[in-house]
Amino acid sequence: MKVVDRIRAMENFVEEMKQKRDTVVKLLMWEIGKNHTDSQKEFDRTVDYIYDTIEAYKKIDRDSAKFQKHSGINAHIRRGPLGVVLCLGPYNYPLNETFCLLIPALIMGNTVIFKPAKHGVLLISPLIEAFKKHFPPGVINILFGRGRVLATPIMESGKVNVLALIGHSSSANSLQESH
């Protein structure tokens, strides 16, 4: 996808996501045990984060169109996708923290393998259709199950270019070693 197409896809996704607010908030409450106010805050903070990420990406794209001079050398730096990103989200803020990993990976043009936390998987279900509607097939791949059981063989395949994980450093080190 071109830059403009990725931005448009993300803008359309977040608009549709906002329409699912009540459902996602209820699922946060039921599944994680957060109170209503905290669940609303997490949802709203996530929407704000997506908009901020879109704006930051627009700035990066604008700035990359300019030449930079450093030590007498002119350079044109273009940022691009890195490949396959494995995103493993935490359970305590399963929407916000997970999307802090997922959204930048998507907007930069990467293919994402996304495994929601074991507590917080249901809140993703109302958003799956929005992902499917606004991104091409194969760009977002969602897996459900135990992290160790799923992530280890994926990392062992050697086909993951970026590991995006919010969790304990021992988990990250173990997954890195299996790569």
Q: Where does each model-flagged region fall?
A:
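Rossmann-like NAD(P) dinucleotide-binding subdomain of oxidoreductase/dehydrogenase enzymes
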Residues: R62-H179
